[in-house]
Amino acid sequence: MALYRAMMADWREAFKNPDLPFYLVQIAGVAWAGEGADYWRGVRDAQQALMNEEKNVYMTVSYDLSEPDNIHPAKKQPMGERLAAAALANTYGKDVNWRCPTVSSVEIVEDKLILNCDHVSSWHTCDGGEIEGFFFVDRNGKREKASLTARGTSLVCDISENTSAEYIEYSVLNYSYTNLLNEHNLPLTPFKSKF
């Protein structure tokens, strides 16, 4: 991301606008390096850090639009709408919902793992099916599909039988199918958390 930071600094200087906003699309999933690999996670993490650390940098998520063999997914309109909403809210001051949901905290209550989330009032899946894209990960990196249910703004799963799992992750792999959206049809931001 050093090059991205340098580009932003150069453009802000060239346009004589130290607050010039930047809008970026978090890299989509692609199976080039293998469906189970997580090479692109580092890129996504760096993009997230860029948004969190730099002023006037806003990011939208595209993982839900991913295609296994195309780094530039064909579904351009939803991405354009997400970027437009971000610009309307942040550059033009409009009251528009643009933030993708994020996991704000992870807690264990009895035998349940609870993911508390921000920027969501309700959840649904784009295909009407069960929530897809979550995995438990043990200390050796072995992944096992995690089954979650929506409960209000939180996501809940039973961990009573997953005694070796140390992490839960979502949209971390180079490519995996995901279908979870908030009430504004915005996808959950990729994450990995220890519990």
Segments predicted by a language model, with ranges:
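Generic beta-strand/beta-sheet core signal
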Residues: 23-27, 60-62, 171
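Catalytic cores of secreted or luminal carbohydrate-active enzymes
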Residues: 44-132
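Solvent-exposed loop/turn segments at secondary-structure junctions
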Residues: 28-32, 64-67
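C-terminal beta-sandwich/jelly-roll accessory domains of carbohydrate-active enzymes
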Residues: 114, 119-195
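Active-site neighborhood of glycoside hydrolase catalytic domains
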Residues: 1-24, 54-56
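Short glycine/threonine-rich loop-to-helix capping motif typified by GTGT followed
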Residues: 30-40, 73-76
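Alpha-helical scaffolding within the catalytic cores
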Residues: 2-10, 38-48
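Hydrophobic, well-ordered secondary-structure elements that form the walls
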Residues: 11, 83, 168
